[in-house]
Amino acid sequence: MEITLSISSSSVIPTRLPNSSCYSNLSFLSSNSNTSSLLLKKARIKTRTTKGFTCNAFFGLGVPELVVIAGVAALVFGPKKLPEVGRSIGQTVKSFQQAAKEFETELKKEPNPTEEISVASEQEKQEIKVSSTKDNV
């Protein structure tokens, strides 16, 4: 796809043109001394295809890294103690998640409107008492 655009010498040529999703490289060719002729050629970029299975779901670690970590843990703790260690780590993570949820709900929780109403009603009662004592004097 080729587009020819003529621009007078006094106008400004944009330094960057918007890219579309499938065409992103633009080639600029200029010619003619009186009028700048801009020829835009859009080049199609080849997308890379990744081979193999990649999973970056656990702290940005891939499958091979997780396998190595599991193997080292099995060697360090042994097959008998490994389930106990896994359970304790799971319980710790669960308690941290529960604490985070509780903290989040406390932050999101609005103050009770009944407390505000009771404070306002007490102030009104005090104002009424003050105005009634002024009337009596």
Swiss-Prot record:
It is a single-pass membrane protein. Residues 1-54 form a transit peptide. GO terms for biological process: protein import into chloroplast thylakoid membrane; protein transport by the Tat complex. One of its GO terms (cellular component) is TAT protein transport complex. Pfam families: TatA_B_E. Part of the twin-arginine translocation (Tat) system that transports large folded proteins containing a characteristic twin-arginine motif in their signal peptide across the thylakoid membrane. Involved in delta pH-dependent protein transport required for chloroplast development, especially thylakoid membrane formation. TATC and TATB mediate precursor recognition, whereas TATA facilitates translocation. HAMAP family: TatA_E. Belongs to the TatA/E family. NCBIfam families: PRK14857.1, PRK14861.1, tatAE. This is Sec-independent protein translocase protein TATA, chloroplastic. It comes from Pisum sativum. The lineage of its organism: Eukaryota, Viridiplantae, Streptophyta, Embryophyta, Tracheophyta.
